[in-house]
Amino acid sequence: MAAAQESQAGASGAPDPDRMGGLRWTRRTNGKLTAGERRRLLAAIAVGQWENALGRVKLALGRLPAGAADVDVKTFEPPDSPLAREAEQACAEQPAAIIGHSYRTWLFGRALAAVDGTDLDLELFYCGSLVHDHGIAQPTPGRDFTLASAERTLACAAAAGVADERAELLADAICVHTTPGVSLDADGPLGCYLQWGAMVDGAGLRMWDVAPANVSEVLRRHPRGDFKRELVELMRAEAAAVPAGRFGLLVRCGVPLAVRMAPFDA
């Protein structure tokens, strides 16, 4: 497995930034998908919909994976570092709906990584969670919103004196987090758990892998408000701004309906 991971992620262990959804790909294309890329993502979306259907059965039956009940989100502490403080300031610039989503993404993503037994860079994951959707509230025609999120993250990293390689690893994870079908081998833990944590909150995906007590604690700390409605509006605005992008495809495939049907009250 280690050899396979190195071959796909590169000798440095970092994901290939030129892969679909990566930092350099997003900069080069502004997020516009080719016909072949759309076909690949459609297949990944179909797999995700099937997994969601099976997962909802697990959720209804209360079937948790081994170790899920042993994870306690109350023990998760924000890192104390200059980068974390920069990310917190950047997070506070966002609309209230995105601020709450950002912190819930952090908690849900960490819980999933703990259940999966996956090591995360806790500082980078915290900061990525807080800033991953920074650009979504101000969609730019023809330019994927993850670029603005990545740029804000790179500014945080520069202000905190973070090395370029480490900063670009985080920016890459933010760019790829909206790509259906991410994998640990190709996309690395940061990008995967940014997506998976965000999707627990956004559409209830993998909620069946999080203990109910942890879900309740996350919502107690960061209430959802009217998040379903607000998220659907943001997704539709991004899809209108970049119709050939990933959110354009996701909206056409019915993800707003999945958001409305998520197992949350709002």
How does the language model describe each region?
Residues F76-A84, D119-G128:
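Short coil-to-beta-strand
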Residues D121-T140, F145, S149, T153, ...:
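His-Asp-centered metal-binding catalytic motifs of divalent-metal-dependent phosphohydrolases/nucleases
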Residues T118-L124, G161-A173:
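Acidic/histidine metal-binding catalytic segments
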Residues W106-G109, S149, T153, A157:
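Buried hydrophobic packing segments
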Residues C91, A113, H134-Q138, A157, ...:
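Short amphipathic alpha-helical interaction patches enriched in hydrophobic/aromatic residues
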Residues Q94-Y103, Q138-A150, A163-D164:
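Active-site metal-coordination segments of metallo-dependent hydrolases
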